[in-house]
Amino acid sequence: MTGSIRSKLSAIDVRQLGTVDYRTAWQLQRELADARVAGGADTLLLLEHPAVYTAGRRTETHERPIDGTPVVGTDRGGKITWHGPGQLVGYPIIGLAEPLDVVNYVRRLEESLIQVCADLGLHAGRVDGRSGVWLPGRPARKVAAIGVRVSRATTLHGFALNCDCDLAAFTAIVPCGISDAAVTSLSAELGRTVTVDEVRATVAAAVCAALDGVLPVGDRVPSHAVPSPL
């Protein structure tokens, strides 16, 4: 056990929601973050969004949709991505322990989703210099994206795991600003339909275990993954 990254000992309040508008979920995150700063519980929201593109703070103009599709600007890290049906989105609203280690927090989120993939029979891992969870190949294929914000020692935003989503939605953008890699889903990799509901409970358990140190962070890099350019 590597120890919890959370400043609170009580269990994480996991909320399994349905389909929630992106802006509505964003407002809920802010309200929960305010409550957490005031001494409230750590919370994990698990949900789906109606189809929407969201742009992190580092998104450049040429990475936006080529057809002029509207984009919601956010205050998370990272660049542009897509959310929509068939994708499980997780928003941990967590008070981090001192000293703050955001990289360690991101690694724990990655580890939880790597474990979910392993439970399904997929050998996923990391690509050096890039966040998220990847499947090996040339090019490597991203199955889960991560983009977070930490304010007042409290986390917002989180991760998106592609279960059975429309991968064509990613073709209108440069996903996460990475042009030399591909995007995939659990269904595409396994050759069967993997619904959001199938993995909800597994994801919730893995995220809580990783944040509490029960699931240690490993050095998992998929073979034949393409390293990031220097």
Curated annotation (Swiss-Prot):
Residues carrying the site annotation Lowers pKa of active site Cys: 142
Gene3D superfamilies named among the record's database cross-references: Bira Bifunctional Protein, Domain 2 (3.30.930.10)
UniProt cross-references to SUPFAM superfamilies, sorted A to Z: Class II aaRS and biotin synthetases
Keyword Acyltransferase carried by entry: yes
InterPro entries: aa-tRNA-synth_II/BPL/LPL, BPL_LPL_catalytic, Octanoyltransferase, Octanoyltransferase_CS
GO terms for MF: lipoyl(octanoyl) transferase activity
EC number(s) given by UniProt: 2.3.1.181
Residues at the catalytic site: 176
Catalytic activity line of the entry: octanoyl-[ACP] + L-lysyl-[protein] = N(6)-octanoyl-L-lysyl-[protein] + holo-[ACP] + H(+)
Subcellular location(s) per record: Cytoplasm
Pathway: Protein modification; protein lipoylation via endogenous pathway; protein N(6)-(lipoyl)lysine from octanoyl-[acyl-carrier-protein]: step 1/2
Family listed: Belongs to the LipB family.
Its biological purpose: Catalyzes the transfer of endogenously produced octanoic acid from octanoyl-acyl-carrier-protein onto the lipoyl domains of lipoate-dependent enzymes. Lipoyl-ACP can also act as a substrate although octanoyl-ACP is likely to be the physiological substrate.
Miscellaneous notes: In the reaction, the free carboxyl group of octanoic acid is attached via an amide linkage to the epsilon-amino group of a specific lysine residue of lipoyl domains of lipoate-dependent enzymes.
Descriptive protein name: Octanoyltransferase
Lineage, top ranks: Bacteria, Bacillati, Actinomycetota, Actinomycetes, Mycobacteriales
